């Protein structure tokens, strides 16, 4: 068995980028679309445009964030970016990215140096992403290639506009947000470290991810765990170079909400929504009896696979199912993910509901 050294990190800088990612695809994370649109609407149109397009360029720049000095917050992000020449900011954020293969980055750097791109660059970039596999081909899909190339050809313009947009986002929303979430991050870190002292690594990862059960420990020498308020209950994965991986784990308390001032906790609301659907209740009953793949569930329910996947995603966001991860694609080419009911998640729903009802008005 691989021996993995466990490291820890904390800072609101991670949530600065995670929050932007989630605000641009709220439905995937169970966030109210209208509220997310309202946050984005606080920015000027040109600021919204560059932040939206940056999600296909920057994502969550794990390697760059990890190297930031303390206290690793939004102010440090903005200051560090401001110290770089504008044309180098995009390259700095993407350096070490695990979604964009090194050969693709080399092609894009050449585009940045020339200030333009040719059809041959597009073809070479598509080949580099396809050969890399592991999600890179999806991230470099045909509709994204032109956007990637256009912005890399205008790296200096991107660097100026992106920093200005990040500052505007900080002023309009995130400065207040990071003051709200910072205590929860440190509490989540302390709790995770306490769990790490008494659980083995696989059990720890399952607990912190609210139901992801890995078949084996990561094949890395070092694993960095960092709390994230916005990612709860999901995990964000990234690489920090050869042999070192980072995972953001959810640190939002069960009685808290992602939307500031919202009375009903997110975890409770997601769970009650999930349980209000008869198909999802049937799925939970099947998964209580045995673990099943999405394809097996589709056959039992006589539903199309995408429909079953949608229901499983809702149950996963509610923390009601365990997802057992081996190889995503088995040797026979079939999806090997298996789901099971998460008993502790079901118990948490009833405990949370009872606590909410007994709490009374604030």
Listing of model-derived features with the role each one plays in the protein:
Residues 23-24, 268, 338:
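Residue-level detector of alpha-helix boundaries and kinks
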Residues 26, 262, 340:
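Charge-dense, low-complexity intrinsically disordered segments
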Residues 202-319, 327, 332-335, 347-352, ...:
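Extended mid-to-C-terminal alpha-helical interaction segments
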Residues 1-217:
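N-terminal, charged low-complexity regulatory/assembly segments
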């Amino acid at each position: 068995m691989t021996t993995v050294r466990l490291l820890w990190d904390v800072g609101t800088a991670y949530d600065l980028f995670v929050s932007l990612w989630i605000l641009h695809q709220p439905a995937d994370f169970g966030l109210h679309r209208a509220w997310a649109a309202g946050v984005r609407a606080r920015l000027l149109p040109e600021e919204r445009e560059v932040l939206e397009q940056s999600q296909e360029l920057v994502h969550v720049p794990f390697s760059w964030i990890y190297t930031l000095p303390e206290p690793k917050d939004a102010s440090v992000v903005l200051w560090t970016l401001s110290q770089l020449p504008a044309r180098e900011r995009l390259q700095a954020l993407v350096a070490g990215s695990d979604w964009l293969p090194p050969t693709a980055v080399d092609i894009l750097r050449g585009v940045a140096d020339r200030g333009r791109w040719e059809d041959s660059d597009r073809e070479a970039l598509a080949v580099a992403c396809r050969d890399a596999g592991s999600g890179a081909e999806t991230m470099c899909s045909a509709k994204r290639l032109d956007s990637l190339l256009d912005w890399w050809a205008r790296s200096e313009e991107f660097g100026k506009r992106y920093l200005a947009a990040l500052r505007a986002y900080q002023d309009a929303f995130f400065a207040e947000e990071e003051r709200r979430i910072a205590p929860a991050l440190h509490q989540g870190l302390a709790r995770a470290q306490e769990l790490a002292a008494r659980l083995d690594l696989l059990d720890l990862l399952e607990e912190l991810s609210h139901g992801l059960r890995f078949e084996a420990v990561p094949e890395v020498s070092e694993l960095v765990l960092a709390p994230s308020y916005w990612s709860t209950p999901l995990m964000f994965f990234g690489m920090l170079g050869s042999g070192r991986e980072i995972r953001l784990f959810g640190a939002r308390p069960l009685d808290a909400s992602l939307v500031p001032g919202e009375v009903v906790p997110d975890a409770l609301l997601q769970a009650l929504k999930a349980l209000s659907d008869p198909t999802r209740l049937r799925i939970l009953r099947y998964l209580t009896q045995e673990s099943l793949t999405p394809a097996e569930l589709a056959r039992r329910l006589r539903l199309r696979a995408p429909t079953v996947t949608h229901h499983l995603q809702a149950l996963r966001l509610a923390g009601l199912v365990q997802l057992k991860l081996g190889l995503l694609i088995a040797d026979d080419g079939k999806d090997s993910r298996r789901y099971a009911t998460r008993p502790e998640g079901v118990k948490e729903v009833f405990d949370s509901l009872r606590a909410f009802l007994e709490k009374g008005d604030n």
